[in-house]
């Protein structure tokens, strides 16, 4: 979910009287500035010359601060992803997880940010992997994971094997596609997985082989469409929503999912929000037409004419 570089200082233009002599051979009377002692003129130039240098120095300081913030943000995101994987691995043994373990093995010198890191990790665990992070012993800061995520529809539970984490992964991919204008390059999907701490081609204890899950299950079940991008050499491929996702999952649901991960309201993304509202209206009209058709057929079978 870009900062513009700060403008750099420009040299201060010379005053009219400081420019080289007249125009077209015209002789001008000495100005007040020309009559000043050389020492004064030199001092004035030094003061004027220092101003753009200070401006450049300030711009460099601002750029350095912005770079430091970006690095800190990237490190925080990386720590959250590593903590999520650590908690999932620890949960395989069904043993409680202590705060001291998290700090020792993952968080390290960022322990002052523990409340924010654990809160963000809990959001990812819930909405992506289907687990609720619960603190059951406040005195000793001990946590456990509980499988809590409910699929959107009962039919989806059957199609996805009743697997909350797989549904969470699908929602992440659908969200990426939607936020990028309804298509996402294959490389962008794999990069998103890596940011979650999931290697596409390596075995993951929740997803199996993620790349195989996406290409063989999600694509074949028509949750995702996969096609070559025209006019690309070497060839590139992209994902989009498949027909099954368009039927079973609304854009507003996916936008709400993304908003929860970022702790924002869906209106934070006005373009996607307007598109989701239009999609909701289309679905409501289609549902009304289908219900009217069903009532008409039922009335016809019963021999009742409504009009």
Curated annotation (Swiss-Prot):
Protein name: Melanoma-associated antigen F1
GO annotations of cellular component type: nucleus
Subunit record text: Interacts (via MAGE domain) with RING-type zinc finger-containing E3 ubiquitin-protein ligases LNX1, TRIM27 and NSMCE1; the interaction is direct.
Alphabetical list of Pfam families matching this protein: MAGE
Keywords on record: Tumor antigen, Ubl conjugation pathway
Described function: Enhances ubiquitin ligase activity of RING-type zinc finger-containing E3 ubiquitin ligases. Proposed to act through recruitment and/or stabilization of the E2 ubiquitin-conjugating enzyme at the E3:substrate complex. MAGEF1-NSMCE1 ubiquitin ligase complex promotes proteasomal degradation of MMS19, a key component of the cytosolic iron-sulfur protein assembly (CIA) machinery. Down-regulation of MMS19 impairs the activity of several DNA repair and metabolism enzymes such as ERCC2/XPD, FANCJ, RTEL1 and POLD1 that require iron-sulfur clusters as cofactors.
Tissue: Ubiquitous.
Gene behind this protein: MAGEF1
Gene3D superfamilies assigned: MAGE homology domain, winged helix WH1 motif, MAGE homology domain, winged helix WH2 motif
Comp. bias (Basic and acidic residues): 16-27, 35-48
Coiled coil region boundaries: none
BP terms from Gene Ontology: negative regulation of double-strand break repair via homologous recombination; negative regulation of transcription by RNA polymerase II; protein ubiquitination; ubiquitin-dependent protein catabolic process
Domain annotation MAGE: ranges: 76-277
Listed InterPro entries: MAGE, MAGE_WH1, MAGE_WH2, MHD_dom
Annotated spans, Disordered: 1-55
Taxonomic source organism: Homo sapiens
């Amino acid at each position: 979910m870009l900062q513009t570089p700060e403008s750099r200082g420009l040299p201060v233009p010379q005053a009219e009287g400081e420019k080289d002599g007249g125009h077209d051979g015209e002789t001008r009377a000495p100005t007040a500035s020309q009559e000043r002692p050389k020492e004064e003129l030199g001092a004035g130039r030094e003061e004027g010359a220092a101003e753009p240098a200070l401006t450049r120095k300030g711009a460099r300081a601002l750029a350095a601060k912005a770079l430091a913030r970006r690095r800190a943000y990237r490190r925080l995101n990386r720590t959250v992803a590593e903590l999520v994987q650590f908690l999932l691995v620890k949960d395989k043994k069904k043993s409680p997880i202590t705060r001291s373990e998290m700090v020792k093995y993952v968080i390290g010198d960022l322990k002052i940010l523990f409340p924010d890191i654990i809160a963000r990790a809990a959001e990812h665990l819930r909405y992506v992997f289907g687990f609720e992070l619960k603190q059951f012993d406040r005195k000793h800061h001990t946590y456990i994971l509980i499988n809590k995520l409910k699929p959107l529809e009962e039919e989806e539970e059957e199609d996805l094997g009743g697997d909350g984490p797989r549904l969470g992964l699908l929602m992440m991919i659908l969200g990426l596609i939607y936020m990028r204008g309804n298509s996402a390059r294959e490389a962008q999907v794999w990069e998103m997985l890596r940011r979650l701490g999931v290697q596409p081609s390596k075995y993951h204890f929740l997803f199996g082989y993620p790349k195989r899950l996406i290409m063989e299950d999600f694509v074949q079940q028509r949750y995702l469409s996969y096609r070559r991008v025209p006019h690309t050499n070497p060839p590139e491929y992209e994902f989009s929503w498949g027909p099954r996702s368009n039927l079973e999952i609304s854009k507003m649901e996916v936008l709400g999912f993304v908003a929860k991960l970022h702790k924002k309201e869906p209106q934070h993304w006005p373009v996607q929000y307007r598109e989701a509202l239009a999609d909701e209206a289309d679905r409501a009209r289609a549902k009304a037409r289908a219900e009217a058709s069903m009532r008409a057929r039922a009335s016809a079978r019963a021999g009742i004419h409504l009009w």
